[in-house]
């Protein structure tokens, strides 16, 4: 058996990253182009376009693709796509840019020219409408909503050429990987069914349990962590990487899972983001996506299993990557081990509910972490990290306590 096909009608990866002489030529041309500044989210999206993670997109979306993605989870040509991938700028700058012009795309933090774009469309959007459709709320306290509302007032659509993957390859050497690289690793391992485990938290016992369930039914698991920006109080990617390494070294059979990373910022779009996570994992070669409690959620904006239900609401042929839906998991003292609502007959009094939010709150406030919450080797890494912090970040517990 072979790996799942890349997303889209052509079923081939479409990386937009230039190399060699073509890269040098385009970088030289970009020096004389008008500059458009990229937010952190837009830079991550551009890199994903570059490495083929957002196959089959050829650039930032025009109006019809934006509208279709927002309202119907599909592009203008009917290809399934659940979240808009857009670039914005101010009205003042947009007025100066002509259709057909080429612009240099510059990361706002590093100042690096990340790529170039041919402007094919300029269009204004109803930001609140996008937020209500994608996030199911336009509450500015939602970090994803705030991200959209802070965008420029005009979107620029057009095809891109990508120059750089930023600092990700050097900063996360051996962890950050392109779809072509993960696919080769899976093939070299003889894997055809691969489950992706999405994480933005250090792995606690529930996470470990989910991954081991997937190992039982798939050839292997890609522990695939987000390397881009998160909200305040979340734990940085380098710390999470170290936590995953010690967990894999001490509690997993060698050759059953691979740690990887990808360059996106978190959108916190809950169910819709779960669909995007499955879509780009298909490009990375994964046949399944582990979907647990409150996947990609934040606060109490989504029900604990809304991300399960949304996969039942899309066309059956929308994605080749399928969800592995796993119920609420916890440590049960009477079962004397990890369990789920489907396997444990006991009551809440017998259970230790494990979540990343709870773990961060306990560590941030210097509380003792209960036994069975996380492996001691992982806690040692986390204690070292929290000892370096000079400011305390308040972490609110939500009803769903998404992991």
From Swiss-Prot:
One of its GO terms (biological process) is sulfate assimilation. One of its GO terms (molecular function) is sulfate adenylyltransferase (ATP) activity. Keywords: ATP-binding, Nucleotide-binding, Nucleotidyltransferase, Transferase. Transmembrane segments: none annotated. InterPro entries: ATP-Sase_PUA-like_dom, PUA-like_sf, Rossmann-like_a/b/a_fold, SO4_adenylyltransferase_pro, Sulfurylase_cat_dom, Sulphate_adenylyltransferase. It is an enzyme of class 2 (transferase). This is Sulfate adenylyltransferase. The gene is sat.
């Amino acid at each position: 058996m072979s790996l799942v096909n890349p997303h889209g009608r052509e079923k081939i990866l479409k990386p937009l990253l230039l190399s060699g002489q073509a890269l040098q030529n385009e970088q030289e041309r970009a020096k004389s182009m008008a500059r458009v500044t990229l937010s952190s989210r837009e830079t991550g999206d551009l890199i994903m376009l570059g490495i083929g993670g957002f196959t089959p997109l050829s650039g930032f979306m025009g109006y019809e693709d934006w509208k279709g993605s927002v309202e119907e989870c599909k592009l203008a040509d009917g290809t399934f796509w659940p979240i808009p991938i857009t670039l914005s700028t101010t009205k003042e700058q947009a007025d100066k840019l002509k259709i057909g012009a080429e612009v240099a795309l510059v990361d706002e933090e590093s100042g690096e020219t990340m790529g170039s774009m041919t402007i094919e469309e300029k269009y204004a959007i109803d930001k609140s409408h996008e937020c209500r459709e994608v996030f199911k709320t336009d509450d500015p306290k939602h970090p994803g909503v705030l991200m959209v509302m802070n965008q420029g007032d005009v979107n620029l659509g057009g095809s891109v050429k990508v120059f750089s993957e930023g600092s990700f390859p050097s900063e996360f050497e051996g962890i950050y990987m392109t779809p072509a690289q993960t696919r080769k690793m899976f093939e070299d391992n003889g894997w055809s069914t691969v489950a992706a485990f999405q994480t933005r938290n250090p792995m606690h016992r529930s996470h470990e349990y989910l991954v081991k369930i997937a190992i039982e039914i798939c050839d292997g698991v890609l522990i695939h962590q987000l390397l881009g920006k998160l909200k305040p109080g979340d734990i940085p990617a380098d710390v999470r990487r170290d936590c995953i390494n010690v967990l894999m070294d001490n509690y997993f059979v060698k050759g059953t899972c691979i740690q990887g990373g990808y360059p996106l910022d978190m959108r916190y779009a809950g169910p819709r983001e779960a669909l995007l996570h499955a879509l780009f994992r298909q490009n990375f070669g994964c046949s399944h996506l582990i979907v647990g409690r409150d996947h990609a959620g934040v606060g109490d904006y989504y029900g604990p299993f809304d991300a399960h239900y949304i996969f039942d609401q899309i066309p059956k042929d929308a994605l080749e990557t399928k969800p592995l839906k796993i119920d609420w998991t916890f440590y049960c003292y009477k079962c004397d081990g990890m369990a789920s609502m489907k396997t444990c007959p006991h009551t809440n009094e017998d259970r230790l509910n494990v979540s990343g939010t709870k773990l961060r709150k306990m560590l941030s406030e210097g509380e003792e972490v209960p036994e069975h919450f996380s492996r001691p080797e992982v806690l040692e890494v986390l204690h070292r990290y929290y000892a370096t912090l000079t400011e305390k970040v308040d972490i609110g517990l939500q009803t769903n306590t998404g992991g």
